[in-house]
A protein has these predicted regions:
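Alpha/beta catalytic cores of nucleotide-metabolism and tRNA/nucleoside-modifying enzymes
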Residues: 1-35, 41, 47-65, 69-70, ...
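Active-site-adjacent beta->alpha loops and helix N-cap segments on the catalytic face
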Residues: 91-102, 147-172, 176-177, 193-195, ...
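Glycine-rich, positively charged N-terminal anion/phosphate-binding segment
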Residues: 6-19, 36-52, 63-132
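Non-cysteine beta-strand/loop elements that form the S-adenosyl-L-methionine
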Residues: 85, 138-146, 206-216, 266-273
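Active-site beta->alpha loop and helix N-cap motifs at the rims of alpha/beta catalytic domains
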Residues: 110-184, 189-197, 205
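Catalytic beta/alpha-barrel core
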Residues: 75, 161-163, 213-223, 244-246
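Active-site beta-loop-alpha junctions enriched in small/polar residues
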Residues: 34-36, 63-65, 88-90, 118-120, ...
Length: 350
């Protein structure tokens, strides 16, 4: 775990308190855990070139690990209020120094910050929370990831069907972390029977959860429309903050969902990958944001593959097919910098 010597109070400053932000009455704009960076980029490439035969380099899981602090730094420059880490398996994090060093990197400017854990054991989760407590504002329990591996290991969305385990995990973190301002939140999907979801939310509220993020789809749903009406119903049945998540691609959509559901914030994943300046009101990625990414990624030592793939995703909708073909084939940082300078100079827009 790398923290650049962060003071133990840096993420508990009053002006950075997420709970207070959610109670402000203003839209809180949240960057999601981004657990599927590499899958999204793989999909991007297959969609962009589906009619052409191309070679796609294998995607490494290190893409998430090596770019996450840099990406959080970028979106914070463009009106993102709160960032999550990618999902970290609590058991590995607790048992392995190597896992901690590779999975969690932060710095003094990286706050407010929520560390999201995949967990199925209350003691291990609370151990993990104790480790990150000095460096983050809180932890989040992933109860919404529908990926097969996660559910097979007892993590993610299967937990919405294990309410007693979720309650125990929340309770143990609350009991063992002494800092009263350290938040404990959960991220869930909805049940087919919404009454079960509302019951779960009421129970975790009574146990002391700080807020709940609701992805408005069931475990089985992938590309179906998001059930914003279900999110609204959940919000109307609890008193704690609720964050809406699912298919938000612009600031206007974020504001519409916020107003439609009556929630306290919105969480965005894919929309921010495509346009990290989305929360600042940009409809497309401005060139300034691209150059900001270049500066941040190079300063933080982001490996080329991660650096390049983020740019590919940011520029996918604002470059032509021919430009994509050339840019995506670049194989060095210097080549990327030369391409950006030659084609776009330092203009503020594409």
């Amino acid at each position: 775990m790398r923290s650049d010597s962060i003071p133990t109070t840096i993420c508990q400053e009053g002006k950075k308190d997420p709970v207070e932000m959610f109670h402000s009455g203003q839209l809180v704009k949240v960057c999601a855990p981004m657990v599927r960076y590499s899958n999204l980029l793989k999909l991007l490439l297959s969609c962009s070139f589906r009619r052409e035969k191309i070679y796609v380099r294998p995607f490494s899981s290190s893409f998430t690990a090596d770019s996450r602090l840099a990406f959080r730094t970028l979106v914070r420059k463009y009106s993102c209020d709160l960032c999550y880490t990618p999902m970290i398996v609590a058991a590995d994090f607790v048992r392995s120094v190597k896992a901690r060093d590779s999975e969690f990197t932060t710095n003094q400017g990286d706050c407010p910050l929520i560390v999201q854990f995949a967990a199925n054991d209350a003691r291990l989760l609370s151990d993990a929370a104790l480790i990150v407590c000095p460096y983050a504002n809180g932890i989040d329990i992933n109860c919404g990831c529908p990926q097969r591996w996660a559910m097979a290991d007892g993590y993610g969305a299967c937990l919405i069907n294990k309410p007693e385990l979720v309650l125990d995990m929340v309770r143990q973190v609350r009991n063992r972390v002494e800092n009263p301002r350290f938040s404990v939140s959960i991220k869930i999907r909805i049940h087919d029977d919404l009454a079960r979801t509302i019951d779960l939310c009421r129970k975790v509220e009574a146990t002391g959860v700080s807020w709940i993020t609701v992805h408005g789809r069931t475990v089985e749903e992938r590309h179906q429309p998001v059930h914003y009406d279900a999110i609204k119903m959940i919000k109307e049945n609890v008193s704690i903050p609720i964050v809406a998540n699912g298919d938000i691609r612009s600031l206007k959509e974020a504001e519409n969902v916020w107003q439609m559901t009556g929630t306290d914030g919105v969480m965005v994943a894919r929309g921010l990958l495509a346009n990290p300046a989305m929360f600042a009101g940009y409809e497309e990625t401005p060139l300034k944001c691209v150059w900001d990414w270049v500066d941040i990624a190079l300063e933080l030592g982001t490996p080329f593959m991660c650096f390049h793939q983020h740019l590919m995703y940011m520029m996918e909708k604002i470059t032509s097919r021919q430009e994509k073909r050339v840019f995506n084939a670049l194989s060095s940082t210097s080549a990327v910098l030369d391409y950006l300078t030659d084609h776009y100079g330092d203009d503020s827009t594409f």
